[in-house]
Amino acid sequence: MNVIDTDDLEKHTPMMRQYLTMKAEHHDMLLFYRMGDFYELFYDDAKRASELLGISLTARGKSGGDPIPMAGLPYHAVEGYLAKLVQIGQSVAICEQIGDPATSKGPVERKVVRIVTPGTLTDEALLQERQDNLLAAVYQGKIGFGYATLDVSSGRFVIAELDTRESLEAELQRTNPVEILYSEDFGELGLLNGFKGKRRRPEWEFDYDTSIKLLLAQFGTKDLHGFGIADARLSLQAAGCLMQYVKDTQRTALPHINAITRFNQTDSIVLDAATRRNLELTQNLAGGRDNTLAAVLDNTATPMGSRILQRWIHQPLRDPKHIQARQQAVTELLDTAAHEGLHEQLKALGDIERIMARLALRTARPRDFARLRQALGLLPELQKSLSTLSAPHTTQLRQHLGEFPAEQALLERAIVDNPPMLIRDGGVIREGYNSELDEWRGLSEGASDYLVQLEAREKERTGINTLKVGYNRVHGYYIEVSRLQSSQVPLNYQRRQTLKNMERYITPELKEYEEKVLSSQGKALALEKQLWEQLFDLILPKLHELQAFARAAAELDVLSNFAERAETLGYTCPELSQDIGVQIEAGRHPVVERVSQTPFIANPVTLHNQRRMLIVTGPNMGGKSTYMRQVALITLMAHIGCFVPAGRALIGPIDRIFTRIGASDDLASGRSTFMVEMTETANILHNATASSLVLMDEIGRGTSTYDGLSLAWSAAEYLAQQVGAMTLFATHYFELTQLPELMAGVYNVHLDAIEHDDTIAFMHTVQEGAASKSYGLQVAALAGVPNKVIKAAKHKLQQLESRDHQAEGTRTPIQSLLALPEPVENPALTKLSSINPDNLTPKQALDLLYELKRLS
């Protein structure tokens, strides 16, 4: 029962009418309805919560004549349940009691005070600290797509104009949003498969004019020209929808979202979705984070540094000036060993980026202020450490760190050393910060001394030696006397509570003091909460500068991390060349060398204008895929400013990296392994350029031998002669090793292996020239294929090789075998290609249609 007909509300009890009205306003999310110490869920929400969270499904009487399914969870455990729900993409509206049950007539007044969705989280208990938490919106135009992402936990707002479906797929893979908003008529829902937290939004939320007004109001500007995004129509529509959604869910000002940037694909090396997946940059093929490039490179000191490192990995730079600026900073940190002390200093900063977002949203907790105080207190020491460094990029970052002595002093005066988790019960504001607060606290805290004095005085006055003065939250202050001595109490003692062996009393004097103390406690807490809110007002004027401090510290963390990784893992600084090419001496795979049980065999690669394609042959398990991937990873690492696992590396300009490595069925889209392989191949052949790095592994193996060989040959030929891309082309079709004899710039290399009797030893070394054989039977034996099968295979192999040898004299050269007949010219197509449809009148178009039918 998620959509309620208001005509039916009268059938229900007053409390259920209140619940159903609120549920109708939040029909697309679970409603946590506060009742005392529990959050209750009813009807379909209860059933879903029971299933998702493993909590009991019960019933709460009847309303409207029907039993009410119900599930509940204790309020103090809500954060753990919320974490489970947002991880699976479920949104939650939290409804609290805001009225006083003692004075309420009918149901206690309630209000939805918080909406929790996967993409709008800021609470550190719900966030993955070392991963971005992105909310995305996508809008489809007549041509192309608009894409926007926002990290509410940091304020980072980015848009992109994307021309093709493939570009959108790559962006989704790169940004990996946890929640996606899409319009009602979005036509590429297949791209969203596998993403959680998908939200279908009405078309009007993407209205262009409304979006512009929203963004101008948010940024406080008259236009968007200053952001360089005024012409990004589709992505601005996506950004507008996203902004409205965040406003609706956060229900507060969003001052930390103060800028928007445009992602331009021309600024970074383009990596399509298949390449990001195949290279296992931040996620392995099983969906985890172990044994990825990020896992090897990430020894950052802060969570915000880890997040920016992953963004760098997915956005390798093309501008050599920016790359060299990072390299110079890393080199200086390494040469001076400054990275060692810097790591410890940065580690103490914590996650200032997300703390500032919570401050902006006014959801920060006392310990956030304490961490900010600590970070600001460390700034002078950090500035001193950086003052000896002269690399331009480091100097620039140092300037952005800033100094905040007034804010640090304020927090030192205001917040106790070890504040509690919440402001709810007080104890956050330091003594001496506010004299009125100290006075009210003094009245409350002096109660224990007063009670001791009162107890001694009453014992002496009454002569009752069992008399005690105490307090509990239910009955307040009391004088306790044993039942045996209760007959001795004075007349002014009024019985308050009877226990098994005791009687409890109150006196007019004690009652008056109780009211005074309880009043002082309430006033102290109210004043402390007021002072707490004022702290936000005093810190937030420096919000933008503090955000800049966080960004600069995070980037320094990554650069320091690069220096440490270079030292620890034996990486060298790559050289950047203006000439196209990739030349690597003693290159290593950054991930495999860390997990391998045996020493990793380093290998070279040489690609340049006169040597643009390598045909890579060798046995299965010989290391072909590892070799190819390491070339791509070293190239990528060089373009993020990181040192690389190689003896030496000279890297030229790269515009794209493509990989066609491995494949599996795409059952969700109904595509076979071979179809996936051919789709990825087509993407490469259409989009690769002479400045691209292309890795092609086992093209054509998903179909018949001759079909596969023909496709592999033609793809290699096209890349070598038409595109001219730098290509590593691994294959088991030995016919392709003839390509170097037929085409300039194509060379053979192979992964070496040694055969001894029926066994094989993989040398994992790259040698010039083609492999002599594939060693398939030996690899099968190593895999545990039964001996009978291996023997039968050997016999069959001898028969086939003998037949091939007999036919050697009549064999057609491979290029002739693969040559296709020249296409016959089609007069209809010739006529069609000569026409400009924009110049045709309706009558001419109709006449042309009849003519084309005749020609065909």
Curated annotation (Swiss-Prot):
<dbReference type="InterPro" id="IPR045076">
    <property type="entry name" value="MutS"/>
</dbReference>
<keyword id="KW-0234">DNA repair</keyword>
<dbReference type="InterPro" id="IPR017261">
    <property type="entry name" value="DNA_mismatch_repair_MutS/MSH"/>
</dbReference>
<keyword id="KW-0227">DNA damage</keyword>
<dbReference type="Pfam" id="PF00488">
    <property type="entry name" value="MutS_V"/>
</dbReference>
<feature type="binding site">
    <location>
        <begin position="618"/>
        <end position="625"/>
    </location>
    <ligand>
        <name>ATP</name>
    </ligand>
</feature>
<dbReference type="Pfam" id="PF05192">
    <property type="entry name" value="MutS_III"/>
</dbReference>
<protein>
    <recommendedName>
        <fullName>DNA mismatch repair protein MutS</fullName>
    </recommendedName>
</protein>
<keyword id="KW-0238">DNA-binding</keyword>
<comment type="function">
    <text>This protein is involved in the repair of mismatches in DNA. It is possible that it carries out the mismatch recognition step. This protein has a weak ATPase activity.</text>
</comment>
<dbReference type="InterPro" id="IPR000432">
    <property type="entry name" value="DNA_mismatch_repair_MutS_C"/>
</dbReference>
<dbReference type="InterPro" id="IPR036187">
    <property type="entry name" value="DNA_mismatch_repair_MutS_sf"/>
</dbReference>
<dbReference type="InterPro" id="IPR005748">
    <property type="entry name" value="DNA_mismatch_repair_MutS"/>
</dbReference>
<dbReference type="InterPro" id="IPR036678">
    <property type="entry name" value="MutS_con_dom_sf"/>
</dbReference>
<dbReference type="InterPro" id="IPR007695">
    <property type="entry name" value="DNA_mismatch_repair_MutS-lik_N"/>
</dbReference>
<dbReference type="GO" id="GO:0005524">
    <property type="term" value="F:ATP binding"/>
</dbReference>
<keyword id="KW-0067">ATP-binding</keyword>
<dbReference type="GO" id="GO:0140664">
    <property type="term" value="F:ATP-dependent DNA damage sensor activity"/>
</dbReference>
<keyword id="KW-0547">Nucleotide-binding</keyword>
<dbReference type="Pfam" id="PF05190">
    <property type="entry name" value="MutS_IV"/>
</dbReference>
<dbReference type="Pfam" id="PF05188">
    <property type="entry name" value="MutS_II"/>
</dbReference>
<dbReference type="InterPro" id="IPR007861">
    <property type="entry name" value="DNA_mismatch_repair_MutS_clamp"/>
</dbReference>
<dbReference type="InterPro" id="IPR016151">
    <property type="entry name" value="DNA_mismatch_repair_MutS_N"/>
</dbReference>
<dbReference type="GO" id="GO:0006298">
    <property type="term" value="P:mismatch repair"/>
</dbReference>
<dbReference type="InterPro" id="IPR027417">
    <property type="entry name" value="P-loop_NTPase"/>
</dbReference>
<dbReference type="GO" id="GO:0003684">
    <property type="term" value="F:damaged DNA binding"/>
</dbReference>
<dbReference type="InterPro" id="IPR007860">
    <property type="entry name" value="DNA_mmatch_repair_MutS_con_dom"/>
</dbReference>
<dbReference type="GO" id="GO:0005829">
    <property type="term" value="C:cytosol"/>
</dbReference>
<dbReference type="InterPro" id="IPR007696">
    <property type="entry name" value="DNA_mismatch_repair_MutS_core"/>
</dbReference>
<comment type="similarity">
    <text>Belongs to the DNA mismatch repair MutS family.</text>
</comment>
<dbReference type="Pfam" id="PF01624">
    <property type="entry name" value="MutS_I"/>
</dbReference>
<dbReference type="GO" id="GO:0030983">
    <property type="term" value="F:mismatched DNA binding"/>
</dbReference>
